[in-house]
């Protein structure tokens, strides 16, 4: 049996290689598995939430500081937006000369916004009414289907009851009625060992023995039952 597949747990000993005449000297060839590994201990770093760091931190103060920074950034962006919106509105107001202003002029942007808001409210109300109508129709359709299903199940149940009772199933054809009234054979009519004691008295009365297989009573009964 070969030993080539067995692992080597120690380096080979020298003495047989080229220039290795001293048998007591170990070989310089060694396996990487024999080298020491994990020679340094890994310490917990400063950002790995050591128990001492967690106990010394003030989480509430850090949370408040982060909230203040976020609020400061929001307040810093808000004036810029207001300034840009006011600058964009000024040219449109300046473009309208004062002499052309009249009471019969079309509605301003604010009035148009109000009208659009009213239109959107009307559209929303119409959509909600349509949605409610659709929901009501679906509920009615579901109730109707459930009633139809219950009626069909009741009809099938009554049909099964009437067809299962031969005394009530007189409305069908004559052949079906005759078949339903026919007496069924028992499951053990043609079994092998049925009525084993039948005919014992007759056999006792005869008390005869024939040393012939073809003229024996068993052979006669067998031929009469299966051949004739």
Swiss-Prot record:
InterPro entries from the UniProt entry: Cwf_Cwc_15
Molecular function in Gene Ontology: RNA binding
Listed Polar residues bias regions: 24-34
Keywords from the named record: Coiled coil, mRNA processing, mRNA splicing, Nucleus, Spliceosome
Pfam families on file: Cwf_Cwc_15 (PF04889)
Main location, first listed in the record: nucleus
Localisation: Nucleus
Coiled-coil region(s): 121-165
Disordered, as annotated region: 1-126
Superkingdom per UniProt: Eukaryota
Role: Involved in pre-mRNA splicing as component of the spliceosome.
Family that this chain belongs to: Belongs to the CWC15 family.
Name of the protein described by the UniProt record: Protein CWC15 homolog A
Source organism of the structure: Xenopus laevis (African clawed frog)
Lineage per the UniProt record: Eukaryota, Metazoa, Chordata, Craniata, Vertebrata
